[in-house]
């Protein structure tokens, strides 16, 4: 059975003695799922998994989704390719939760590092549950019944502004109209409350004249260093994060 060691941060755990290229047994799956819910992001080293292994692992946790804007592995549309260099720098450097422009965003994301830069390239994660816990009662009451709009168009505005960008992403725009999510959600496993907004995809609070100031406060609050952990990548490292309760961003 694999071992789980909590990080020194408010979230995250390292999982060792675990070979993700092999089929997980029922007890192993349950332990991993509980650990994901509890620690919010799990880190693995030296995982030599194939595309088939990657897809099989992800499928244990629910229905897989294909990203509408990024290239994917041939024959494996559920596996997104994230690749950047000097000619193709990353456009996504804001804190975000994956694909909240969907009515039902994915439960989590499983990212494996294959080509690691000599410097930079770390990933930061931030816990939205601990951030909620630290809100004062007035803010908790104020936010409880609010809804926010999450938008693909808002999140990919830089790509859409490029020459030919709107034509290239026309299908993604059509298939992903703006959606509404509660500002405060409850995690289905832990029961913890979560501040469910992110700077990349959340465009505004529905029907509230104070939308701008509320989001400004929330973004400043959830981006604080005390809620973060940092992961330094190595070849064949894996980060598996709970998309229901954390933000993440690359460090470039």
Model-derived features: positions:
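Non-heme Fe(II) oxygenase catalytic core, chiefly the N-lobe of the double-stranded beta-helix
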Residues: 2-235, 243-252
């Amino acid at each position: 059975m694999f071992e789980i060691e909590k990080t020194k941060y408010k979230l995250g755990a390292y999982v060792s003695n675990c070979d993700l290229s092999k089929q997980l047994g029922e007890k192993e799956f349950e332990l991993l799922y509980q650990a994901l819910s509890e620690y919010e992001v799990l880190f693995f080293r030296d995982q030599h998994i194939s595309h088939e292994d990657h897809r099989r692992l992800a499928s244990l946790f629910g229905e897989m989704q294909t990203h509408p804007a990024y290239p994917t592995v041939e024959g494996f549309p559920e596996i997104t390719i994230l690749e950047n260099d000097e000619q193709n720098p990353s456009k996504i450097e804001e804190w975000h939760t994956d694909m909240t422009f969907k009515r039902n965003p994915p439960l989590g994301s499983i990212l494996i590092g294959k080509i690691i830069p000599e410097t930079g390239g770390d990933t930061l994660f931030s816990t939205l549950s601990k951030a909620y816990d630290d809100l004062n009662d007035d803010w908790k009451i104020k936010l409880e019944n609010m809804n926010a709009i999450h938008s693909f168009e808002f999140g990919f505005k830089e790509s859409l502004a490029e020459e030919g960008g709107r034509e290239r992403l026309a299908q993604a725009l059509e298939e992903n109209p703006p959606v509404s999510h509660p500002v405060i959600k409850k995690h289905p496993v832990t029961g913890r409350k979560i501040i469910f907004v992110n700077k990349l995809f959340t465009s505004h609070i529905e029907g509230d004249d104070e939308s701008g100031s509320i989001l400004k406060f929330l973004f400043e609050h959830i981006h604080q260093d005390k809620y973060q952990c940092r992961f330094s990548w190595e070849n064949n490292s894996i980060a598996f994060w709970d998309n229901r309760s954390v933000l993440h961003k690359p460090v470039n």
